[in-house]
From Swiss-Prot:
Taxonomic superkingdom: Eukaryota
Keywords, alphabetical: Ribonucleoprotein, Ribosomal protein
GO molecular function, one term: structural constituent of ribosome
Pfam families reported in the protein's UniProt record: Ribosomal_L22 (PF00237)
Disulfide bonds: none
Region called Disordered, residue ranges: 159-186
Family: Belongs to the universal ribosomal protein uL22 family.
Protein species of origin: Aedes albopictus
GO cellular component terms listed in the entry, alphabetical order: cytosolic large ribosomal subunit
NCBIfam families associated with the record: uL22_arch_euk
A GO biological-process term: cytoplasmic translation
Protein's name in the database: Large ribosomal subunit protein uL22
SUPFAM superfamilies reported in the protein's UniProt record: Ribosomal protein L22
Length: 186
């Protein structure tokens, strides 16, 4: 078992999954992974299924040279997006694995959130393609390692409201006017 880049803050309330040397493009997978970061597990799974069906797009923020525009990217406040189906399928498999790990550990699956997800480059695999005049060019692939951890979201407890209403903050100008008024009244 390898070391993860980031250990969860509360190991009892989280679960992990990883995949090594996956034959899927690093750049597409990196953009897809960043899109599902901090999403609830159910929403992330639904999003990736929608990407496979081209109902939602993945915004391309870093590796977007030559990437076309799509209207679905407006949701992410950008104009550049794609539907990397293979990356989405690989991430769905990892999420399914992490969900099974969470179920085994007795965590509440409906409250899980994608806390950490990281995509690293794996060693390139080399093939060859034949060119004109007897030349040979490389035909490389860019596999990747993916690791993710899901954490059970804690309930947010709101502070009890005090009896006194909070004082409204006044600007310097209004404070000055109030002081002048008080000086006149005295």
């Amino acid at each position: 078992m390898g070391r993860y880049a980031k250990e969860p803050d509360n190991p009892a309330k989280s679960c992990k999954a990883r995949g090594s040397n996956l034959r899927v493009h690093f750049k597409n997978t990196r953009e897809t992974a960043l899109a599902i970061k901090r999403m609830p597990l159910r929403r992330a799974q639904k999003f990736l299924k929608n990407v496979c069906e081209k109902k939602e797009c993945v915004p391309f923020r870093r590796f977007n040279g030559g990437v076309g525009r799509c209207a679905q990217a407006k949701h992410w406040n950008t104009s550049v997006g794609r539907w990397p189906k293979k990356s989405a399928e690989f991430l769905l498999q990892l999420l399914k694995n992490a969900e099974a790990n969470a179920d085994y550990r007795g965590l509440d699956v409906d409250r899980l959130v994608v806390d950490h997800i990281q995509v690293n480059r794996a060693p390139c695999l080399r093939r060859r393609t034949y060119r004109a005049h007897g030349r040979i060019n490389p035909y490389m692939s860019s596999p990747c390692h993916i690791e993710l951890s899901l954490t059970e979201k804690e309930d947010v407890v709101s502070k009890a409201a005090e009896n006194e209403p909070a004082k409204k903050k006044l600007s310097k100008k209004k404070l000055q006017r109030q002081k002048e008024k008080m000086m006149r009244n005295e």
